[in-house]
């Protein structure tokens, strides 16, 4: 039994050691629990501090001065604004270089002007399209400016060309000149550099001028068609006196005021939108979106116009002039009868002039329809298939819309100078007189001898030259060189 005593002593020692460990374990776990609760409290405190910091960030923008901001805070914002997720980019899960990456998206440093993209140099794949657009724009610009200026100057400086008919043609040339001179450079600059000249002002002014030009052309074609019908059915003398300026200006005012009134909603519909790009900073584009700051009644009217714009555009600026011109021509042909049945009281010269005027109206209508048809087709495609088209396709359709208007402004004066014999002859005389100094004396001598009688007959028989009862001596056609 003696061996039991060492065993009992050893068991007692082991039991004492175990009890001591158990008694000391509760404070250990309690200490750990207290440490965890303190850590959670400290974490919650840090979270509240972060929330307070975020609240301060929202109301005190000076703390974010080192990060990029939107260029126009009051304007349209991108769907994913470039805002850092933490006031300290290197902490709390943020990458240390996130601020530098966000700043690299802009083309210039804060406080400096944005750099303009130049796709022409160095030469890349996009440079070829940029060169093609510039070349086409230069050709259209040169032809349109020279042609429209020629028509306006010829009508203005020639005494016998100041009639309502020629004044309407000159007003067409004036609006085409304004569209080419002001709108074409802005559109081409935006297409090449993705930056908008004059910002929101040009986004509103360019559509207004283009729609006004279409309205002037539409109402001018209707007025010319009415004039042709009136001449065909009138019993008054075919040669009428030269109209006064007040009468001509009154007729032009009706056309201009009506066209500009119908184009006023374009000023309220368009606005500038800026979108961030990974390599080029911000991209400027014009979108159809009425401003939310408009009055409620005006905003609803603009929204109604936006919803009905496509069909209004198609009906008023495409179908109306074509149908009106075709109807007037058919009625005029019906009143006059077939071309083979000529009246004895009508001279051959007068028949030629009437045929020439009818050809002018028909030619203007055909050119107008040919130039506005692509624009209307693109509008219909964008209205119904915009969700299925890519951004590049939509941009291409928008460029086609713009160039169709510019083509109309460049082709119309060329057609007038080719079809209208008085305008074309005056243009050739002016070019000859300006380019060749000896042409002036020779033309005067020849006109004094043999061409005087021919000019008188053309003046008296053409509607372009309304000869008054007591007219001064005949003046040379064209502008004084």
From Swiss-Prot:
Query: Pfam families recorded for this chain?
Result: 7tm_1 (PF00001)
Record GO terms (molecular function): G protein-coupled peptide receptor activity; G protein-coupled receptor activity; peptide binding; prosaposin receptor activity
Tissue note? Expressed in primary cortical astrocytes (at protein level). Expressed in the central nervous system.
The record's listing under PROSITE patterns reads: G_PROTEIN_RECEP_F1_2
GO process annotations (BP): adenylate cyclase-inhibiting G protein-coupled receptor signaling pathway; Bergmann glial cell differentiation; cellular response to reactive oxygen species; negative regulation of astrocyte differentiation; negative regulation of neuron differentiation; negative regulation of smoothened signaling pathway; negative regulation of systemic arterial blood pressure; positive regulation of cerebellar granule cell precursor proliferation
User: Can you list the GO cellular component terms from the UniProt entry?
Assistant: ciliary membrane; membrane; plasma membrane; receptor complex
Q: Where is the signal peptide?
A: 1-25
- Intrachain S-S bonds: 203-286
PTM summary: O-glycosylated.
For this UniProt record, give its keywords in alphabetical order, as a comma-separated list: Cell membrane, Cell projection, Disulfide bond, G-protein coupled receptor, Glycoprotein, Membrane, Phosphoprotein, Receptor, Signal, Transducer, Transmembrane, Transmembrane helix, Ubl conjugation
Regions of this protein lying in the Cytoplasmic compartment? 156-167, 227-251, 332-361, 420-481
Q: How does it sit in the membrane?
A: Multi-pass membrane protein
Q: Which residues carry this modification: Phosphothreonine?
A: 479
Assembly and interaction partners: Interacts with the PTCH1 receptor.
- Provide the function of this protein: G-protein coupled receptor. Has been shown to bind the neuroprotective and glioprotective factor prosaposin (PSAP), leading to endocytosis followed by an ERK phosphorylation cascade. However, other studies have shown that prosaposin does not increase activity. It has been suggested that GPR37L1 is a constitutively active receptor which signals through the guanine nucleotide-binding protein G(s) subunit alpha. Participates in the regulation of postnatal cerebellar development by modulating the Shh pathway.
Q: Domains: what does the record tell us?
A: The N-terminal region is required for constitutive signal transduction.
This chain belongs to the protein called G-protein coupled receptor 37-like 1
Instruction: Please name the source species.
Output: Homo sapiens (Human)
């Amino acid at each position: 039994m003696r061996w039991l005593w060492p065993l009992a002593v050893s068991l007692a020692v082991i039991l004492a050691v175990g009890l001591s460990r158990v008694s000391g374990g509760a404070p250990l776990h309690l200490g750990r629990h207290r440490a965890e609760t303190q850590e959670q409290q400290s974490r919650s405190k840090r979270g509240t501090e972060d929330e307070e910091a975020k609240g301060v960030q929202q109301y005190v923008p000076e703390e974010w001065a080192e990060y990029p901001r939107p260029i126009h805070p009051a304007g349209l914002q991108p769907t994913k604004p470039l805002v850092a997720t933490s006031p300290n980019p290197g902490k709390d899960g943020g990458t240390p270089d996130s601020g530098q990456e966000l700043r690299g998206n802009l083309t210039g440093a804060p406080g400096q002007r944005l750099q303009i993209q130049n796709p022409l140099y160095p030469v890349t794949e996009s440079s070829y399209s940029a060169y093609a657009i510039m070349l086409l724009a230069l050709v259209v610009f040169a032809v349109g400016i020279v042609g429209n200026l020629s028509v306006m100057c010829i009508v203005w400086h020639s005494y016998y060309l100041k009639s309502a008919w020629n004044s309407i043609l000159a007003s067409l040339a004036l609006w085409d000149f304004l569209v080419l001179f002001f709108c074409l450079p802005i559109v081409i600059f935006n297409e090449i550099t993705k930056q908008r000249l004059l910002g929101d002002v040009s986004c509103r002014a360019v559509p207004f001028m283009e729609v006004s030009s279409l309205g002037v052309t539409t109402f001018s074609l209707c007025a010319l068609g009415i004039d042709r019908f009136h001449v065909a059915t009138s019993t008054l003398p075919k040669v009428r006196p030269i109209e006064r300026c007040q009468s001509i200006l009154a007729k032009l005012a009706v056309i201009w005021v009506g066209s500009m009134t119908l184009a006023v909603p374009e000023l309220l519909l368009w606005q500038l939108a800026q979108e961030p790009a990974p390599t080029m900073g911000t991209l400027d584009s014009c979108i159809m979106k009425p401003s939310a700051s408009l009055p409620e009644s005006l905003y609803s009217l603009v929204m109604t116009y936006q919803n009905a714009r496509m069909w209004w555009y198609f009906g008023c600026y495409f179908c109306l002039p074509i149908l009106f011109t075709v109807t007037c021509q058919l009625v005029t042909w019906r009143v006059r009868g077939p071309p083979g049945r000529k009246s004895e009281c009508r001279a051959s010269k007068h028949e030629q002039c009437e045929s020439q005027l009818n050809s002018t109206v028909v030619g203007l209508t055909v050119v107008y329809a040919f130039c506005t048809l692509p624009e209307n087709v693109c509008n219909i495609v964008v209205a119904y298939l915009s969700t299925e088209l890519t951004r590049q396709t939509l941009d291409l359709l928008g460029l086609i819309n713009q160039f169709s208007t510019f083509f109309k402004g460049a082709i119309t004066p060329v057609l007038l100078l080719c079809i209208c014999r008085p305008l074309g002859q005056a243009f050739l005389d002016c070019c000859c007189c300006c380019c060749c100094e000896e042409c002036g004396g020779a033309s005067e001598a020849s006109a004094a001898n043999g061409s005087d009688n021919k000019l008188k007959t053309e003046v008296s028989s053409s509607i372009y030259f309304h000869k008054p009862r007591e007219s001064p001596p005949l003046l040379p056609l064209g502008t004084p060189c």
